[in-house]
Amino acid sequence: MDILNRKVQNASVTGVNCSLPTKEGARKIPSFFIGECGLDRVCATPYDLQLSAFEAQIRFSEDLGCPLLLHCVRALDDVLRLKRGTTQPWVWHGFRGKPQQLQQLLEHGFYVSFGFRHNVDSLRACPADRLFLETDDTPEPIAMLYAEVARIRQTTPEQLNEQCWKNLTGL
């Protein structure tokens, strides 16, 4: 089971408006994360609009007391800057970076979610208590990913699932 895809609440950018539900409305939605949100220097949406929307989503996450599920492409420095002063956990979705980038994220308190496309050295280096797994846009079942990651990390899929569940419920 892909635990990060449980009950994810989306906030979207439309034109120049960041469309977020009210706090009262959001509290009625059975959600656990705010996201997927973040910054992407490759997408067509102007970066300044993305930045404004992301800042609003961060405030929303803080106001509601919900963890933030983060999408980031080529914007690490801005994300690390914006993470300072926040209290809610952030989960980096689809991490493919090098161990040096992983270390930066861990130093800033991030949790890291890996999919089928990952850097093996980063996957090995990620502490178990900061690890999540996801299928995202691949058709393969999550059980295949658990088996692959368990082999790489020299554990069992069952132990890996227990750890990821513990991480999720600890957020």
Question: What function would you assign to each model-found segment?
Answer:
Residues 1-171:
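Mid-domain alpha/beta scaffold segments of enzyme catalytic cores
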